Amino acid sequence: MMRHDRNVTEIDAETRPDENLWHSGDSAVGAPPAATPAAMTDLPEDRYLNRELSWLDFNARVLALADDNSLPLLERAKFLAIFASNLDEFYMVRVAGLKRRDEMGLSVRSADGLTPRKQLALIGEHTQRIATRHARVFLDSVRPALAEEGIHIVTWADLDQAERDELSTYFTEQVFPVLTPLAVDPAHPFPFVSGLSLNLAVMVRQTEDGGQHFARVKVPNNVDRFVELAAPRAGAEGENRGVVRFLPMEELIAAFLPLLFPGMEIVEHHAFRITRNADMEVEEDRDEDLLQALERELARRRFGPPVRLEIADDMTEGMLELLLRELDVHPGDVIEVPGLLDLSSLRQIYDLDRPALKDPAFVPDTHPAFADRESPKSIFATLREGDVLVHHPYDSFSTSVQRFIQQAAADPNVLAIKQTLYRTSGDSPIVRALIEAAEAGKQAVALVEIKARFDEQANIRWARALEQAGVHVVYGLVGLKTHCKTCLVVRREGSAIRRYCHIGTGNYNSKTARLYEDVGLLTAAPDIGADLTDLFNSLTGYSRKVSYRNLLVAPHGIRTGIIERVEREIAAHRERGQGRIRLKMNALVDEQVIDSLYRASQAGVRVEVVVRGICALRPGVQGYSENIFVRSILGRFLEHSRIIHFRNINEFWIGSADMMHRNLDRRVEVLAQVKDPKLTAQLDELFESALDPSTRCWELGPDGQWTPSPQEGHTVRDHQVSLMERHRSP
């Protein structure tokens, strides 16, 4: 049931005036670089897929994992939670940006020709479908399966009297004191409802005159969402071993609403949740102190306008209309689902100590190049012998990249450590190493990107801690986010100076390095060392260098560098055939890069894309993309590496940049060429595994639909499992 469908046409109408992925970060208002008009090319107008709908398709693939009975049960619950968190961020940033464009009258059409209003309408329809499916996967599949394993998520009606008595004591002692029922009447205005909070909308009736009044009760966000009952239900000896029962907190509060409203009759109560605009605008050019400006904007973010209202499907029309009016939410922004709201809380269930219901434990191995070297100089000695390519999480981050930085901090011959920090872990060994380096008298420089979305507050804390320890902290370039993953170590060796470098695709975060798939290059190559020296000078000083020896650096060099190499691959293919371009990345959106791949396809070059998330390229269309093949791999680890290969010109590149406007135009990004044949062979093996016809994946069709592959009845291999087995083998 979608009661708000009656109003969807209001969004779709063109009468009113006319960015993230899960960390997409695109500017919500600024227009992207214009694609080459179709009239100036032999390419059709409809050659792009909509990026917003493509992102929703990505999240639908995450949901498909939750619905996969072959996966361990608690992993399926985790994917339900990831789906919910992903969708929250999408609305807080991407949908919020489209709404702002629409409200400001900026009717800039997307690359596929849609106005902001039309995109909002399509997003609402698509979201309602997948949100309903999300709820049904939980209700009809995951929750019953959990119950079969002794993990029961119950309702108040399922409880016996002993359990209700137990919860009555818990509620009175632990929950009731922190609840604040907020009435709405002439003396009490409608309360502020914070974004992503879970709430109960309550209608009460006065017993004296029968007058009805609305009140809101916020479900506390500093207690567990699921209340665990202290004892299993009575049963035969051994029958309940391992059985746990959980009651959602909102059900507990609802059961005791009479205690919150004594003397009043509870007429009805319903759960609801709103999402607010969390996209920030910091006027960097006008603010001398970026850190203070960002802190002011962070304080404002919690008061952003609502962009989504989630309700349970049993909410009455009258209650819904009241919420729409008081919260100033458009009916088309209502998402109505059966069952529980905010399934991101299922992470609490995932954290149960039930290893049999999770993926088998995986412990990363130390890279062979570092396995037998334990002295403080071992990493440097290894890199003097040759470059090393690490592939996380299969190669341990802590015994490679982290050890590289820690040994640099402890080595008396190291003179300087310069590093970019975009997202780092809560108790970061990388940050501690930089502090130790500064305290030891080394020149320690940290470029902390305090504008990393949803990590701003944490990065501000780290920036201040680093500054207090004597680390030189800079915040990058005005108007640009610094997203590159680079570290430069300067070491005195005899009478000479040698530079050691790390360039990666992932963050310097020891926790996510166990969950994210990334690659990194550790090298003592002089040309890369010189390039990183120039790069850090541009980040910390007034250097405006835009060309490098062995790097492509955005915002000036990556788009042009990639397109130029596509053209060289085309020319080489025309000369001797065998043209092939392979790309692995998180997102492919940039129209100019996409058009260059279309030209390669038209020339007969085979183009293979492995993309985790958004893909605006339309493959498999006769005349311009019949030689392009796109697939998506999702699994236990988040596929995060960015790798590009041009076969005929024999170049492999790795780095931080996806092919998106934000990466190529509004960020400092770095791609590095990997030249060592032993290392390029490793990257080639990675591509061959990902592109193997039997690899479990989704394939993108010319109609924009993603289809599971291989088809039923064919041999199926898991790319990530194969890599784990390969790294475990001697």
From Swiss-Prot:
One MF annotation (Gene Ontology) recorded for this entry: metal ion binding
SUPFAM superfamilies listed in its UniProt record: Phospholipase D/nuclease, PHP14-like, PPK N-terminal domain-like
Post-translational modification comment from the UniProt entry: An intermediate of this reaction is the autophosphorylated ppk in which a phosphate is covalently linked to a histidine residue through a N-P bond.
Catalyzed chemical reaction(s): [phosphate](n) + ATP = [phosphate](n+1) + ADP
Cofactor: Mg(2+)
UniProt-listed GO biological process terms: polyphosphate biosynthetic process
GO cellular component terms listed in the entry, alphabetical order: polyphosphate kinase complex
Gene3D superfamilies: Endonuclease Chain A, Polyphosphate kinase middle domain, Polyphosphate kinase N-terminal domain
Biased composition (Basic and acidic residues): 1-21
EC number, as in UniProt: 2.7.4.1
Binding site for Mg(2+): R423, R453
Keywords: ATP-binding, Kinase, Magnesium, Metal-binding, Nucleotide-binding, Phosphoprotein, Transferase
Pfam families: PP_kinase (PF02503), PP_kinase_C (PF13090), PP_kinase_C_1 (PF17941), PP_kinase_N (PF13089)
Residues annotated as the enzyme's active site: H483 (phosphohistidine intermediate)
Binding site for ATP: N86, Y516, R612, H640
Keyword NADP annotated: no
Annotated spans, Disordered: 1-39
Enzyme type, top EC level: transferase
Similarity field: Belongs to the polyphosphate kinase 1 (PPK1) family.
UniProt-listed HAMAP family: Polyphosphate_kinase
Known role: Catalyzes the reversible transfer of the terminal phosphate of ATP to form a long-chain polyphosphate (polyP).
PANTHER family in the record: POLYPHOSPHATE KINASE (PTHR30218:SF0)
Name recorded for this polypeptide: Polyphosphate kinase
Species per Swiss-Prot/TrEMBL record: Mycobacterium avium (strain 104)
Source organism phylogeny: Bacteria, Bacillati, Actinomycetota, Actinomycetes, Mycobacteriales
Name of the gene encoding the protein in the UniProt record: ppk
